A protein has these predicted regions:
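Short acidic, Pro/Gly- and aromatic-enriched capping/linker segments at domain boundaries
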Residues: 202-213
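Cleft-lining beta-strand/loop regions that shape enzyme active-site pockets
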Residues: 1-203
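Conserved functional hotspot residues or short segments at active or partner-binding sites
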Residues: 214, 218-238
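Long, folded non-catalytic interaction modules
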Residues: 102-103, 211, 216
């Protein structure tokens, strides 16, 4: 309720009244609303020639950002022949998920064209769907960000890092890369958020959210309440 009241047009002002135990009277603070932009992809070089890509959430521009970061790192490696790239590390630890088409697009970045990424199944006929590594399944308008992808992204050795905080879209990507033997999954068991939820309007101001289907990896494994088991179990050091 509080968040709903604070939302508004960018650059508009809002007064917040705060109550603190240490202050006898409420404090009024004026803040200016703005669009919050979260960078969902980061990258860097790890020691000994490994390109590291960290995805914190699957958002609208995550696929394009992933391609951009990959191309930049691989271009740097091609320019310095003394330090060839040996592999790719995709870090999905503590990534809670996000948009389904973004997960399909990120998977397509590393997989062969047209292979299955994820499928859904439920009681209703329209719940049975399959999503593949092709533009029609990950694009939501605009140009295809994978058009300019460095082809080495699909062939270099690859490791995916996961843990108990990797959920939903993260599990879709990890499961697809694991089933197609494109990458080795390393870490601990993922969260197990593999349900498809549909919002059904009841009145003008209310709705009900129901679980209508489940996600399945290309090999037919259910993600729900099971998660993705890594190929190599490695606990994180504190």
């Amino acid at each position: 309720e509080a968040v709903k009241l604070m939302r508004g047009k960018p650059k508009s002002a809002i007064n917040l009244t705060l109550s603190r135990k240490s202050e006898p009277l409420p404090i009024v603070v004026t803040i200016v609303r703005d669009v919050i932009r979260v960078q969902s992809v980061r990258s860097k070089w790890l020691e000994q020639g490994y390109a590291y890509i960290r995805i914190t959430q699957f958002q609208e521009h995550t696929v394009a950002s992933t391609v951009s970061h990959l191309n930049k790192l691989l271009q740097q490696a091609e320019a310095d022949t003394a330090k060839p790239v040996k592999g790719i590390v995709l870090d999905l630890r503590n990534d809670p998920g996000g948009l389904l088409h973004a997960a399909v697009g990120v998977s397509a970045t590393f997989l062969r064209d047209n292979v299955t990424v994820v499928s859904t199944d439920g009681r209703q006929p329209d719940a049975k769907r399959s999503f593949a590594a092709k533009p029609s399944d990950y694009l939501r308008g605009g140009s295809d960000p994978l058009t300019g992808l460095n082809p080495k992204a699909k062939t270099l050795p690859m490791v995916v890092l996961v843990n108990g905080g990797s959920a939903s879209a993260s599990e879709i990507v990890a499961g697809a890369l694991q089933d197609h033997k494109r990458a080795v999954v390393l870490g601990t068991q993922t969260f197990g958020k593999g349900s498809v939820q549909t919002i059904l309007p009841l009145t003008s101001s209310t709705a009900i959210k129901l679980t209508t289907a489940r996600y399945y990896t290309p090999a037919g494994r259910s993600i729900q309440a099971k998660g993705i088991r890594p190929d190599f179990w490695v606990e994180e050091s504190e």
